[in-house]
Regions:
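Short, basic and Ser/Thr-rich N-terminal targeting/leader segments
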Residues: 6-8, 101-103
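Electrostatic, structured charged patches in enzyme active sites and in nucleic-acid/phosphate-binding
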Residues: 51-54, 62
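Short beta-strand
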Residues: 62-65, 95-101
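An amphipathic, hydrophobic-aromatic interaction surface with interspersed Lys/Arg
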Residues: 51, 91-97
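Short linear proline/tyrosine/threonine-rich motifs used for host-factor recruitment
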Residues: 22-24
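DNA replication initiation modules
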Residues: 2-5, 11-17, 27-43, 47, ...
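Residue-level detector of short, conserved catalytic/binding motifs and their immediate flanks
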Residues: 10, 71, 94, 105
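Beta-rich nucleic-acid/ligand-interaction surfaces
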Residues: 102-110
Length: 208
């Protein structure tokens, strides 16, 4: 995380109740308004500046805006020894930490932006609509710099304290195995079935 800590990508956050749920709301190191879009870029600071500023605000945490060609995977409320979690973590040899609550896991790393499933809307490249960025049932969130426009609540409570590594293949696998929307899966199965039927027909014709 050393290189990222030196870049002006950092902000603060605080917990607030919104619609009956607790949200981590971002704010600037000077206490002002902040966000993850380019219009707030001038409010982002280095990690050291954010860490110092957090001491001035009760209950404040430090967060990082996920930059292009980087990703953040949040596995919420899951134990490290859970079979699914073990399977996921085995694919990533990159910086990993405990979440703010201590009962979740954060994975940070690099990924090749050009190899990910995307589409363009209003001149902006976004993650394909076939995938969730925040899965509604399995508690997983996958944010990719410049595609999902989000920030991560950083803790520094490391599980695997190693340099950020390129995990493009693992990110694509996680998207397909854990973040794919049901309608996209159904479409894929239907297409596969049609392909099998076509192959069967062709084979039958050849035997005639």
């Amino acid at each position: 995380m050393k290189n990222l800590k030196e870049r002006r990508l950092w902000l603060l956050w605080k917990k607030q109740e919104r619609n009956g749920k607790t949200a981590k709301v971002p704010f600037a190191a000077n206490g002002g308004k902040c966000g993850t879009s380019e219009e707030y870029k001038q409010t982002w600071v280095t990690y050291q500046e954010a860490e110092q500023a957090a001491k001035k605000f009760k209950g404040a945490g430090v967060g990082i805006v996920i930059p292009q060609n980087h990703f953040f995977l949040d596995i919420d409320h899951q134990d490290q020894n859970d079979p699914v979690v073990k399977d996921i973590l085995s694919r990533f040899n990159t910086y990993t930490e405990y979440s703010v609550s201590g009962d979740g896991i954060h994975v940070y790393g690099l990924c090749d932006f050009s190899k990910l499933p995307t589409y363009t809307e209003d001149g902006r490249v976004k993650l394909s609509k076939e995938y969730y960025a925040h899965h509604p049932t399995n508690g997983m969130e996958l944010y990719i710099g410049q595609l999902t426009n989000r920030y991560a609540a950083y803790t520094g409570n490391a599980i695997l304290d190693v340099p950020l590594a390129d995990c493009t293949t693992a990110v694509i696998d996680i998207l397909n195995e854990y973040m794919r929307k049901p309608e996209a899966k159904a479409k894929e199965i239907k297409t596969t079935d049609l392909g099998k039927r076509a192959d069967s027909i062709i084979q039958a014709l050849r035997r005639q």
